[in-house]
């Protein structure tokens, strides 16, 4: 039942899949780019900031199961800091994210060949943009290909983002690489989906985006877990019911129209700053002047360590994320865990987080009027915000990372067992 798992950077959901496969004794190897041992001497001589960056790449698994392919990723991390920014240019730089993914994919494919010859693995598990060569090699040896799609499939994403570029052309500069990807990159994504036997998705929005040509594939839907910070139960009490100050609406994420910020700005324009304060925390995708021209009186908060993010959340009343395209935005569950009701679109991937009128409200994507209407509702029902916040906190706590990983591991185990039985029946005729 051994599975080779690969991902260049090993984010939270990858780590939880890895842990679940390890618990089930399904993990053959985990491949990534950079790894770091906190006890290594070389770590301690690095500058503090880079030391922290490296230690994010520590993986708590047996050393024999951990394989790294670090060189191109190290170049991507280090050289731009030395002024060589062009080496990491989108799709063009020799140390770009795309170049790192392709190089990593080829390296993993070489390892698959070695393991498959000795029948040491049954399947490979890879992620969007880093799976094509791995899957091609796996197919040569009759291995199953598991594909995790963390965000809506590219055809759906591209269609929605191009529509946004037409609807709000001034915001198109914030839409990012999704509408500028080359044909070659899109062909890679298409090839990965075609070769996949199993597709893992974090929610209904992503699974619905799977193209018709791939609807026959085995699909596993497993929602991401909610953050469980030490301050989970430090809910902000009656703050939401305080009518003597403006209602504080929080947006968190990259500051672009993919996340619906243009629609939220338009909705906020309907309210006096005396009544509603918009707090925006995230990374700039355009100069600050662009945003201030659109909405002069919003409050900007830069990114910060997680404990400070939680403190900011507890100072707000509601969380709004009217996204156009997502996979499943973790920040929604983080906000809920701190007692904030939600105003979100189904396109955030968090439709299941909304118990209407209890944990928040769903609004249609691209509808500032609907956002404004729900903010007005909260203004008129401020005494209900603490109650809804508590409901949101309780509902978010039902989603755990352990459940996320265990569901994927359990369903993969069942799928591979059934496939073994099918192959045996074919042999017996």
Spans of model-derived segments:
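Short alpha-helical donor nucleotide-sugar binding micro-motif in glycosyltransferases
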Residues: 193, 311-316
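Aromatic "clamp/platform" in nucleotide-sugar-dependent glycosyltransferases that forms part
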Residues: 324
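Acceptor-binding helix/loop patch of EC 2.4 sugar-transfer enzymes
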Residues: 43-45, 76-95, 141, 145-187
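Conserved donor-binding/catalytic core segment of Leloir-type glycosyltransferases
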Residues: 226, 240-259, 265-270
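Donor nucleotide-sugar binding/catalytic pocket of nucleotide-sugar-dependent glycosyltransferases
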Residues: 166-233
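Nucleotide-activated donor-binding/catalytic signature segment of Leloir-type glycosyltransferases, i.e.
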Residues: 288-310
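Conserved acidic donor-binding segment of nucleotide-sugar-dependent glycosyltransferases
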Residues: 356-357, 361-367, 377-382
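Short hydrophobic beta-strand element within catalytic cores of glycosyltransferases
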Residues: 332, 341-344
